[in-house]
Amino acid sequence: MKKWLPAVALVAAFVASLYVGATQIDNFWSALFNPDSNEILWQIRFPRVTAAVIVGAALAVAGLLAQGACNNAVAEPAILGTAAGASFGAVLAISAGLVQVGTIGAIACGTIGALLTTSLTFKLAAIRGALSSFGLILVGIAVSAIFTALVGIASAMVSRADARSISFWSFGSLALITPDNLIGVAITTVIGIAIAWKICRSKSAQ
């Protein structure tokens, strides 16, 4: 029974998140089973809450991969410089006028930045002979600090409006989620989790 408690809690939190909001939804339970009956519920709240669950799963897998790569329970993407690299890649592209905040281009640039900084962390750790779990974390913290500072510099180069947008976007928001781009989020996450599963299986077999 205990193994089902997290799933039950997730479903309960999901439904509660659909119900609670600035606007009261009349006949909530009826609207919940009739997608065409309430635009606020199905066009705004449902995509955002679903995206929150999907992104949460992706973050959990990312944390698991970081812990496995470093063999350290406290490792996470933020410590390895991955998060700072993602922010820097996106912010640099936005400040250069190549992409707009919240677009696929910004996400792609962020992904490239994350890959490059994570690779840099491992390369620097290898050069220093510090490929231990503790050494990787120390190098990752240094790389993260450097790229976080670079994000601040890049943000200072854009207009005040763009700087606010970048700041808001960097902290993360579900405000731009729609039923259309929710599909892209779901597909990308499923592919990423499948790749992570394959990596974990191959490592376990060694």
Kindly label every feature range from the protein language model.
Residues 1-206:
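Alpha-helical transmembrane segments in inner-membrane proteins
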